[in-house]
Amino acid sequence: MRRKDSYEYRCQCFRYLLSKDILPSSEEVNDWAVPWLVFCHYAPYDFMLREPGSPKYGIPIPMFNLVYHDCLVIPWMMEKLPEEDYMLYALLNGGAPYLIRDPAYLGIDGAFTLEEEMPWEKHLERVRIVSDFHENVGDAELVKHEILDDKGFRQRSTFANGYAVEVDLQTGSYSISKE
């Protein structure tokens, strides 16, 4: 079997699931399968898979979502670490939040034990913020992304329906607007 045949057979499986009102997903997204997927399990930035505080290679930007944002639902990690708030990346990407992320293995693939757990009510508040924003932009194309300072701490994403979010990764702040 050729690779192309494998892709075609897997897409047939996804189409079959859709025909039975079953939502196909993939652990991670492959561009050849996007037309048939409804969601994936995650698509984090590279640095999110390594231990907190590990160096970043370049400035993380929502490149994948600039192409595929309005095609499928991508859930985002919501951890708030001393050095990074992942909720800001969820907003910047217009993604859905993870309510609970139960990793198979601790210490790898973005699953690291936090010294201080966030109170459940605070976590729910953050999840609601991202959920509400995703409800507004989930079907809208991500049309523009801007880096607003030299270090890439301040970034803005703009969606086709006029919503925009600006984040400051250094201060942990964000603002949502609608034009």
Specify the residue positions occupied by each region the protein language model found:
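Active-site-proximal substrate-binding groove within the catalytic cores of carbohydrate-active enzymes
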Residues: R2-E179
